Amino acid sequence: MTTMKALVIAEPRNMVWTTRATPQPAPGEVLIKIVSAGICGTDIHAWAGNQPFFSYPRVLGHELCADIVETGSAVEGFAVGQRVALIPYLSCYQCDACQSGKTNCCEHISVIGVHQDGGFCDYLSVPASNLLAVDALAPEAAALIEPFAISAHAVRRAAVAQGDAVLVVGAGPIGLGAAAIAASNGARVIVADTSEYRRQHVSQQLGLPALNPADADFIATLRAEFNGQLALTLIDATGNPAAMNAAVNLIRHGGTVVYVGLHKGDLVIPDSEFHKKESTLMGSRNATREDFDRVREFMAAGKLRADMMLNRRFAFSTLAEHFEEAVINNRELIKGVIDFDR
């Protein structure tokens, strides 16, 4: 295994195969063989050239499940053959954010698969401190711990509790994860999405009500679902500026809006509504180890399942040839996982 295959985004809309030297782990690192990898919205935006924190060329892939094949000389607590998932955020642990426990928004953060090469390749060497043991989980579930952790962080930021009225806008992977986790917290959850296909997915896989925000009676239906009130908490997972600008109109007085979806541009929020309601507005970025640990526990307990978001699987060996058609142009894709043994 002196060389390996890697899938590289050479430039926007140009994904190519390359052969690279297999990395060697530094003393505190572990060499992992990729088993499964999730395809993230970040990867899709990077392919299209509209990911704001990106440079080319780049090996994508930050949602990873892998097997350990070699450990560095200083690594303790992990062994060859162990199955692991990756926490892809490399934080400095020195800045004010890190020192206050917010390693997820480190001032100098580097994300594997975004700011440096990731796991759309056979092997990857990563810090042992960024691994989670996942021997009890199926590989496709373990690969999806990362997007579920982003959802979990947004729910934790909002302090969602038993009985809260929560509206999740956007039934993509992060929105689906947020809805599932908020419901596990005991909240009354409604999901809004303009896609009928995604609303059906919400109903079938999460067992939650799903509304079309474009319907003329959307707000009236929302109030009916929430006993005459608007949402106490709104989690926006769309990254759509129109939806994000309108979010404050869908919360009750004293309500909270959490932006977990990212928009590359400015937003215009109706200040009169924002102030009148004494609204709380917050962003949610990435996740911390606490969120990863919680998702792993929820998966082990059956509270979270891969099929809550996963609806397509791809073979790594043919991904470059089919990426545009099967991923970029697939209107029914919610979440895809790459299988490396196919």
State the predicted function of each range.
Residues 1-4, 245, 289-342:
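C-terminal hydrophobic helical "lid"/dimerization subdomain
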Residues 21-37, 50-96, 135-137:
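Glycine-rich beta-strand-centered segment in the early N-terminal region that forms part
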Residues 85, 232-235:
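N-terminal Rossmann-like NAD(P) cofactor-binding module of classical short-chain dehydrogenase/reductase
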Residues 90-169, 307:
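NAD(P)H dinucleotide-binding glycine-rich loop of Rossmann-like/cofactor-binding domains
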Residues 137-215:
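Mid-domain Rossmann-like dinucleotide-binding core that forms the NAD(H)/NADP(H) cofactor-binding site
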Residues 217-228:
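Short amphipathic alpha-helix with an adjacent loop that forms part of the alpha/beta core around
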